[in-house]
Every structure is written in structure tokens, then in C-alpha cells.
Amino acid sequence: MASAYVVAVLHRTSLGVAGLDAQVRFDVGAGALASFAVLQLLVYAALQVPVGLLLDRFGSLRLIVGGALVMAAGQALMAFADGVTGAVLARVLVGAGDAMTFISVLRLVPQWFPARRVPVVTQLTGLVGQLGQVLSAVPLAALLAGAGWSTAFVSAAAAGVFVAILALVALRDSPQQRIASGDALTMSRLGADLANAWRHPGTRLGLWSHFTAQFPGTVFALIWGYPFLVAGEGLSRGAASGLLTLFVLTGMAAGPLIGVLVQRHPLRRSWLVLGIIAANALGWGLVLAWPGRAPLAVLVVLVLALALGGPGSMIGFEFARTFNPPNRLGTATGIVNVGGFVASLVAILLIGLILDARTGGQATYDIADFKIAMSVQYAIGAIGLIGILRTRKLARRRLAADHGVTVRPLREVLAEKGWFSGERIGKS
């Protein structure tokens, strides 16, 4: 199960470490390079809801196998593409296969584990999947620098074929069934499931949580982090790969902790999301405000903050799971998963356009160019923050109306525990 997501993340992030090589190979500027990743994410995001509907009908196994083979085809095409057209088609295939993988893996979790363990297992799934970023940051980057472009991407394609075979041999949709199919698809059923999932404010809270928490880390890992560190901050390729590896390892360490917190404090999940968003904003603020190039220690702080975004965005899927019945879980999960990738593709495109505007389309960036371009993330984050605060209010009202559960203000709860009084300080 997890291996499918590991390889999907490898495919998804492969362009990030190959960004500078891709500019040389295809003779394109930052805007055109960004368009590769934007198109990949656009395909991914556009397919989330259709894939979610198909997932509820056909089950996880079929979609995971199909997704792995489609991504493998995309990477094989990328290996031998010598022009922009081939590269664009390759990233479209990668985005399409990727769209079929993650939510299919997530749907397996409640089928195999009791409900009380789902938050932690969901985080562990995301944690293991991030090994794909390690594979792109280290061995794939080493293959690019050594054996070359074609060998690197053929190797990535081979990994996709291997995962498809492994899933066919070992994976089951549930302990009871190898392939679990839902009811036959009809237009009325599709429309009803989609409308009901969207109408629930808990689903939309999940979408905005995913939108806001995920995109800074995705933008960094998928395409702009490596060029920012190398061309902007002046790090060596090895040092940049090291920071990307730190990004992955930090996310892996944070995931289980966040899962336990969600499990123990289900009514305070949104505050975890808001805290992670604040960490992302402060991390970038420190780097952008630093005069000139930031020292390595400051860049480490940025990477540590951004690494929390991936595990934090997984809380959005918990909102989808707990606010929707099992028969439309795939649809609700697909809606939530659209959020972070829409935000990411908008940010990636805007950063590329700003860099091109400042350098005339040449790959001659300096740190000032990157600082101006990266600051656009604050505008996107502000939109997401507004969405979270509004839908949280609506979701809490719905929770009280449907289940009689009232979420008390956090400040009131903390005040009762003595956090805002001298009594608490005296006890510490």
C-alpha cells in the first residue's frame, strides 16, 4: 500500500531536482519550466473529484495499478523527450497517474484499521510516502548528475512498473475482498454524492485546511526549492539536496506526532492546522526579511517549518472522513485533495512569471529576484486562512445541530486550566 505512494511522490517531485537540467535540455525559461509543473498539478487537481467518484465505484486496487502504469509511461516519455511537447505530455501522464494513487491509498486505511487508529495510520501513510522525496532528492539527483537524464527517468519509470506488479500480487481492497466494488455509477448518483459532500461545511473545512497548509511545502519540494537554494541562496547542489532530505525527514518525524494529537484532541484539529500555517509564514518571513543571502541555520529553520505542511494538510482528510458517510468517502477525499494542489499550481505559476519578468526569461536569478517571487505565497495563504475560519464556524454549527456537540472556545478552555493566570505559572 505505502510503496505505491512512495513511488507516486518520487514521480511527482522528480521535476524539482531536475529543474535546472530541464531548462538546459529544453532551452526554456522559468515560466515555461513552471508551466510543466503547473500542468502536472492542474491535471492532478482536475481529476481528484472524478477519481474519487470512480474510487467509490471500483475500489483502490484497480486505481492504484492503473495509476502506477500511467506514471511509468510518463517518466519513460520524459526520459527520451527532446522538446517541450514531449515534456508537457510526460508531465500530464505523471499528473494523471498521481491523481489515482494517493486517495486510493487513503481509502484503504479505514478498511484495514479500527477508527481510533485511523488518524495515526493516515499520518504514517503520508510519512512513508515522503520517502519518495528522498528518492528524488538523493538517488535520482545522483543519476541526473552522473549517468544522465535518460537513465534517471528510465529508472523512475521502472519503479512505477515494479509497484504495479507488487500491487497486483499483494494488495487487497479489504480483509474480506480482494476487489471491493460499489454501486453502479449513474449520473443522478454521481451528482447527489458530489453535491452532498460539497454541501457539508466539514468537507470544505478539509479543503481549505489542505489548500493552506500544503502548498508552501509542495511548491518548495516540487519545483522551486532546489533552484531557490542553488541559484538564489548560493548553496551547492549537495547542500541543497541535503536540505530537501531534511525536509522529508522532518515531515516523517512530525507526522506521527500530529496524528496522535488529532487522535487525542479531535475537536481542536483546526488549531493544529492554524499553528502549522503560522509556522510556514514565520519561516518564510525570516528568510525574506534577512538582508541578502540567509545563513544555513536560517535556511534550516525554513525547511523545518515548511516540512510541517505535509503532515498538517493530512488533517484535511480527517475532516472529510469524520464529516461524511463511508459510501461517499472517496468523493469527499477527492474534493479535499483538490485544495492544496490548486494552491500549489497557482503559486508555482506566479513565482515563475515573476522570475521571468525580473530576468527577461533567462536563468540568471539572484536572491532579490527569488525574495520578490516567493513573497506571493502570502497572498495565497491569506485566501486559504479566510476559508478555514469561515468554514470552521459553519462546521461547528453543523456539529452542534446534528450531534449536539458544542466546541468551546480554546481560550475559555485554557483559562479554566490556568494558562492565563498566575496560578498556572506557579505550578510550572
Model segments located where?
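Juxtamembrane intracellular "pre-TM" segments in multi-pass secondary transporters
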Residues: 174-207, 406-417
